[in-house]
C-alpha cells in the first residue's frame, strides 16, 4: 500500500459483532471501541465472515484505520441458478452501498472457492460498480483460478503459483471461549 509492503494480520470477525447482554444494537462508540481493540492489539485487518457488515462497523473501520475484507454473502460453497443470482445481486448492492468507504480493500466472493465463470462474473460486477476503487476481488480456495486477484486457504498451505495467498484462519483458536486470562487477545 502506497508502495510499501504490509503484513496483513487481524481477525476473522463475525459480521454481527455483537456484545454480551447488548446484542447487535450497539452505539457507534462501542463499534469504534471494539474495532479499535483490533488495532491496539497490533491488527490491521478484519475479515468479516460470510455476509456484509452493517454500515456502522464499515464506517467505524474507516475511523479507526482498520482495513476490511468485505464479503457479500455465501453458503460455504459455489451455487447455481437463483441462489447464484442472489449472491451476485447482493455483491452488486454491497459494492454500491460501501464503495465510498476507504477501509474496504478486498471484496470476497465466497468463503469457499467458486468456479472460474463465477469469478469472471463477480469481477465484471466490481468493474462496473467500482471501476476506480482499486480493490482486489477473490475468494478462498481460488489460488488456481487466474482471474481471481487473491486467494485464501484456511490452514497454512500456499498452493498459489500466481496470486497473493491469504491464510484466512491462520490461528483458529476456539479455546478462548472456555478459558480467558491476561494474555488472551482482545475480547
What are the residue ranges of the model-derived segments?
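N-terminal carbohydrate-binding accessory modules
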Residues: 1-39, 59
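Substrate-binding/catalytic cleft of secreted carbohydrate-active enzymes
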Residues: 32-187
Amino acid at each position: 500500500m502506497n508502495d510499501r509492503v504490509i503484513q496483513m494480520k487481524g481477525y476473522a470477525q463475525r459480521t454481527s459483532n455483537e456484545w454480551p447482554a447488548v446484542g447487535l444494537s450497539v452505539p457507534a462508540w462501542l463499534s469504534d471501541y471494539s474495532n479499535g481493540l483490533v488495532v491496539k492489539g497490533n491488527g490491521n485487518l478484519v475479515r468479516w465472515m460470510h455476509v456484509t457488515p452493517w454500515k456502522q462497523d464499515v464506517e467505524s473501520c474507516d475511523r479507526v484505520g482498520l482495513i476490511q475484507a468485505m464479503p457479500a454473502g455465501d453458503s460455504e460453497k459455489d451455487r447455481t441458478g437463483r441462489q447464484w443470482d442472489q449472491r451476485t445481486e447482493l455483491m452488486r448492492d454491497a459494492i454500491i452501498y460501501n464503495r465510498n468507504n476507504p477501509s474496504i480493500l478486498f471484496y470476497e466472493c465466497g468463503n469457499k472457492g467458486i468456479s472460474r465463470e463465477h469469478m469472471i462474473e463477480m469481477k465484471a460486477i466490481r468493474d462496473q460498480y467500482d471501476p476506480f476503487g482499486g480493490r482486489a476481488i477473490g475468494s478462498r480456495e481460488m489460488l488456481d483460478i487466474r482471474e481471481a486477484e487473491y486467494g485464501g486457504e484456511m490452514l497454512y498451505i500456499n498452493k498459489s503459483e500466481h496470486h497473493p495467498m491469504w491464510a484466512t484462519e491462520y490461528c483458529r483458536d476456539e479455546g478462548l471461549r472456555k478459558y480467558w486470562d491476561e494474555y488472551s487477545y482482545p475480547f
